[in-house]
Amino acid sequence: MLILWLVGAFIVLIQWIYRLNRDYCILGFFAKRIRTKNGQNPESIAPLVKGSTIFANSFDLYGKDHSGVFEHSRDCAKKLGKSYAEYAMGTAIYNVIDADSAERVLNDPNLINKGTIYDFLHPFLRTGLLTSTGKKWHARRKMLSPTFHFNILNQFQEIFITESLKFLEQFKGNDEAIISLNEVIPRFTLNSICETAMGVKLDEMAEKGDRYRENFRQIEECFIRRMSNPLLWSDTLFKMFAEKDYASALDVVHGFSSEIIAKRRDQLNDEIDSRGNTQTAEDELFTSKKRFAMLDTLILAEKDGLIDHIGICEEVDTLMFEGYDTTSIGLMFGLMNMSLYPEEQEKCYQEIQANIDDELNILNIGQLNKLKNLEYFIKETMRLFPSVPAMGRETTRETELSNGLILPKGSQIFVHVFDIHRNPEYWDSPEEFRPERFLPENSQNRHTYAYIPFSAGQRNCIGQKFAMQEMKTLMVALLKQFQILPEIDPKTIVFQTGLTLRTKNQIHVKLVRRK
């Protein structure tokens, strides 16, 4: 009798577990399942990645290095051929590799919250423009948008020219030089963002700038280590087992940005003193400045009670990260491609010679806008090598997508820009480098969201025009003086996941001075 009772209880338990498992991925730590509007199997729309352990996809990245983490997403996209789903650590994850889904996600006003993974950046960036949500994000976006107005960007052109010429000075007296782009380009972009956005030259802080970049890499290392190990997703466990080197790196980068802010405050106070140190003098300073740094906007907003010092620190850390790192990636791969495709380089060079005077001090945005071949070249570079290969969102309520999927509240959505940009549905021979793809006649029928290097929708990159202007200016200056030759076989490049797109190996090019 007891045996029959136990058998019956076991059957009931199995039935209960079966019913529960229809709504929750039990072994994925009770992740609520994705479902469909019409009741069809969601895997017919978004195939499910087979987990590496019995715990669904929770430990798929465990033990993988930076290259392994990067390749995991690429392998899933190639194997499944469409946007796909995963379940990990109690969460449903929808991975987008098609333009239709990307458009739906990036345009949804209810999907502006960044994914949970961005929480790992809070100790570094706190809740600045990149990581904030809701009213705070809207207020900060509104506050900072005017600082990227055409008139402001036009004022920055003088700095971009100066920094570009300073970049070339390091090769003075050399007819040729082999350089590591990973070393020289980040220094250039950090100098540029500090002088334009912060109003502070790094000439006397070069060593501190180098320390900033070194410790930025340490922060990135900890971020990837944490992302790939679910055991470290807990703040408590991360602090117990992995935070020591992270904390010291944070001290360095925050100390650097704080010094930048302090220097700019001192400069502004000195200007006010020179005008008579009155409220009128202070008001006139902010209304009559010839060049208005983005940091000035934040300091002015502080005086109006719209932001506090911590808020300024948040936005400075964010602007420095996004303005220095993402642009350097675009330039590194852009100059690499210049070396690998000599015919395209020559086309850009001839266009520059036809439109730009040798006296670069008078180079303006209007002239840069005439360089269409260079623009197509940069766009094709960013298609193949997007600085940010993926971006994340989190659903704050049950969300229905255009393909019929219904994502539960708290689901994570990753828009894989790298895979969308190489999706053969939108790009013929997607692995080939062909700038002519961006000619108007070749672009007009392409899905708008098949190319999103600066994201899209209301959370698109606020500084995309700034980045394009900076990249064009350096490329013009460099091509005016040098021919760029290859020193790397592109087949040997090993990509890595980071805060932005990384390579395991250094990218070298050879500069040969033009006669």
UniProtKB/Swiss-Prot annotation:
Function: May be involved in the metabolism of insect hormones and in the breakdown of synthetic insecticides.
Protein name as catalogued: Probable cytochrome P450 4p3
Listed GO CC annotations: endoplasmic reticulum membrane
A molecular-function term among this protein's GO annotations: monooxygenase activity
Organism (species): Drosophila melanogaster (Fruit fly)
Bilayer disposition of the protein: Peripheral membrane protein
UniProt superkingdom: Eukaryota
EC number: 1.14.-.-
Record has Oxidoreductase as a keyword: yes
UniProt subcellular location: Endoplasmic reticulum membrane; Microsome membrane
Chief localization: endoplasmic reticulum
InterPro entries documented for this protein: Cyt_P450 (IPR001128), Cyt_P450_CS (IPR017972), Cyt_P450_E_grp-I (IPR002401), Cyt_P450_sf (IPR036396), Cytochrome_P450_Monoox (IPR050196)
Cofactor: heme
Enzyme class per UniProt: oxidoreductase
Coiled coil: none
SUPFAM superfamilies listed in its UniProt record: Cytochrome P450 (SSF48264)
Keyword entries, A-Z: Endoplasmic reticulum, Heme, Iron, Membrane, Metal-binding, Microsome, Monooxygenase, Oxidoreductase
Residues that hold heme according to the record: 322, 461
Family under the similarity heading: Belongs to the cytochrome P450 family.
